[in-house]
A protein has these predicted regions:
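Short glycine/proline-centered loop/turn elements that form peptide/ligand docking sites
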Residues: 140-143
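A short amphipathic helical element positioned immediately N-terminal to and/or at the very start
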Residues: 14-23
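Glycine/proline-centered hinge or cleavage motifs at structural transition points of membrane proteins
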Residues: 151-152, 165
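Charged/polar positions on well-ordered alpha helices
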Residues: 41, 149-150
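Membrane-water interface segments at the C-terminal ends of transmembrane alpha-helices
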Residues: 1-12, 26-138, 162-181
Length: 181
């Protein structure tokens, strides 16, 4: 908002000089680059993790306990605020973390960088992808997959030639929603 006001008020005329000065700053360029890197990485990882959880829930037969555990684990980040997940990562995997220091004996671990942010953001946002992709997988016509199986296709071939192409718009949507968040 201040940039917009300065672009009008600066010398009395509207101009883009203030924006040129801001975009020329190396720290601003680095911040934008890091933001885009984190966004793309988190979008891709969240979509893949959401796809994995949705696929297992819809297609894989698991016991009631494992299925219930899967649902709880996938929905837990939705009901807890993101700062709780961040704090949990710090308490478990930080320099004095329970897992890093006491179980693994690692004393110089840092979760405050690029990868720590990417992991926490992925764990925070993948349930959104999971819910979107689960609905998509449930609505795929099973007769299309059965026809491919009847023609002799393996499970992998059915997934790559029937299921995945039908899911590509939903995967793109899940990526974009996560990237924007």
């Amino acid at each position: 908002a201040i940039l917009l006001v300065d672009s009008f008020v600066g010398d009395g005329s509207f101009g883009f000089g203030i924006f040129e000065r801001i975009f020329a700053m190396p720290t601003f360029t680095k911040a934008i680059t890091n933001t885009l890197k984190v966004g793309f990485l988190v979008g891709i990882l969240s979509a893949l993790l959401g796809l994995l959880f949705a696929y297992v829930e819809v297609y894989v037969r698991v016991g009631k306990f494992v299925g219930g555990l899967f649902k709880v684990v996938s929905m837990l980040p939705v009901v807890s605020p993101p700062f709780v997940l961040s704090l949990s990562m710090i308490m478990l995997f930080g320099k004095s973390g329970i897992i890093t220091r006491f179980l693994l004996g690692i004393y110089d671990n840092s979760v405050y960088g690029f990868w720590g942010i990417a992991v926490v953001q992925t764990l925070t946002f993948f349930p959104v992808c999971y819910m979107m992709l689960k609905g998509l997988l449930k609505n795929i016509d099973p007769s299309l997959e059965e026809a491919a199986r009847d023609m002799g296709a393996s499970r992998w071939k059915v997934f790559t030639s029937v299921t995945l192409p039908l899911m590509l718009p939903g995967l793109g949507n899940a990526f974009l929603v996560t990237f924007i968040e």
